[in-house]
A protein has these predicted regions:
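Residues that define the transmembrane beta-barrel architecture of outer-membrane proteins
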Residues: 27-31, 98-102, 133-137, 179-183, ...
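Residue-level signature of outer-membrane beta-barrel architecture
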Residues: 39-42, 110-111, 135, 144-146, ...
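Transmembrane beta-strands of outer-membrane beta-barrel pores
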Residues: 1, 56-60, 122-128, 157-163, ...
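Gram-negative outer-membrane beta-barrel transporters
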Residues: 114-115, 204-206, 225-306, 340, ...
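Face-selective signature of the C-terminal outer-membrane beta-barrel domain
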Residues: 19-131
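Repeated loop/turn-to-beta-strand initiation elements of outer-membrane beta-barrel proteins
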Residues: 45, 115-120, 149-153, 193-198, ...
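Membrane-embedded beta-barrel scaffold of Gram-negative outer-membrane proteins
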Residues: 1-4, 146, 153, 177-242, ...
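Conserved C-terminal beta-signal and adjacent last beta-strands/turns
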Residues: 50, 183, 269-369
Length: 369
């Protein structure tokens, strides 16, 4: 593998970016088993559902790696650049990983009338690694109510118990499982005989032992992070289906906050807190084999302060498409992506990011038999 390091230079013929090589090999094995029983039972004149089950999994991993010296700074004149011959360090065996998870779960859905339903369940999970052994009973519950044939409201509660592989910088060991609680309230809807569906949800999640800023750590050859408590809360809105016989729409918008409860600062600022996705396609009535469409993807600003501040302002991407069914087996399709040639960064983390694809176009012929 090759890692990029450094910052681009704008004053001379060097890019300011050097290459660092690594040899890395990992062997891993995962074994899983599951048993589940489902059934129905009658109570108080209603039929209800229930299920119980057992999950077991075991994960083992062992890795060995060696870092080489820098290949030198890449010049902007690539034909004249000659990389330096690296010298390699000794091979290092990373600490082995082993995780065994066992869980027993049970749940039931109770029909308390034609429109009201309760969901109750619990999950006992035991997690054992080379660094710790933890267990927890995680209950969950939900309620749904059909206000009308078109609208259903719901509320849910879930207890969280999730293993992680990141190194806790305070203990220098694998971080203990994330624990927390999640709440959600929402309404789901269905119109036009199910051709169009919508939803709106409000949620809040509190999590302890959360990896606040995971960065690749050469000392452990895996991600390490300070551990803390976070709260995420927000709103999601969606609409999917047919507005008319010829017009299809997919709409999604979400806004949320992720807060470090100990410092009061924004958590994971490299994750957008607002996103909007709109996709529409239209079948031309006069030419029913022809379909045209467009999509817009937007997100608000993000930034990364792992080593130095790198910021990406809010941006939107515009894509278009057109397809034509020559017959039942052959279809022609043309796509145009990022039509405005927006320049943007993705994957900001650890002081690095990747430029998204510039404006590009594709023509395809698809065969189906």
């Amino acid at each position: 593998m090759l890692y990029l390091n450094g910052s681009p230079s704008a004053t001379d013929n060097t890019s300011g970016i050097s290459l660092l090589p690594e040899i890395y090999n990992q062997k891993f094995k995962e074994t899983t088993a599951n048993a589940d029983i489902q059934g129905t039972f009658n109570l108080l004149g209603q039929q209800h559902e229930a299920n119980i089950g057992y999950n077991w999994s075991k994960y083992n991993a062992q890795s060995v790696y060696s870092y080489g010296s820098s290949l030198g700074v890449i010049t902007t004149d690539l034909p004249s650049w000659t990389p330096e011959e690296p010298t390699w360090g000794d091979f290092t065996y990373a600490d082995p990983e082993e995780r065994v998870m066992k869980s027993v779960y049970g749940a039931t859905r109770l029909h308390l009338g034609e429109d009201l339903k309760f969901i109750l369940g619990a999950n006992y999970t035991e997690i054992e690694t080379l660094d710790y052994k933890k267990n927890k009973v995680s209950p969950y519950a939900g309620i749904t109510y059909n206000f009308t044939p078109e609208y259903t409201g719901y509320m849910s509660y879930t207890s969280i118990f999730r293993p992680q592989t990141v190194i806790d910088l305070s203990t220098k060991q694998t971080a203990v499982p994330v624990e927390g609680e999640s709440y959600e309230v929402g309404v789901k809807s269905s119109w036009l005989d199910g051709a169009l569906t919508g939803n709106i949800a409000i949620f809040r999640t509190d999590e302890d032992n959360f990896a606040l800023n995971p960065l690749w750590d050469p000392l452990y050859n895996k991600y390490s992070s300070p551990i803390g408590t976070i709260r995420s809360q927000g709103v999601e809105v969606g609409l999917t289906g047919k507005l008319t016989d010829n017009l299809d729409l997919v709409f999604g918008f979400s806004t949320f906050s992720l807060k470090n409860m100990e410092s009061g600062e924004r958590g994971r600022p490299n994750i957008p807190t607002q996103t909007l996705n709109v996709l529409a396609s239209y079948t031309v009535p006069q030419i029913p084999k022809l379909k045209v469409g467009a999509s817009i993807k937007w997100q608000d600003d993000i930034h990364d302060t792992s080593y130095s501040t790198v910021k990406q302002d809010a941006y939107a991407l515009l894509n278009v498409m057109a397809s034509y069914d020559l017959n039942e087996h052959v279809m022609f399709q043309v796509n145009g992506n990022n039509l405005t040639n927006e320049k943007y960064l993705t994957g900001l983390s650890g002081g690095q990011g990747y430029y998204g694809a510039p404006a590009n176009y594709t023509v395809a012929v698809k065969f189906k038999y």
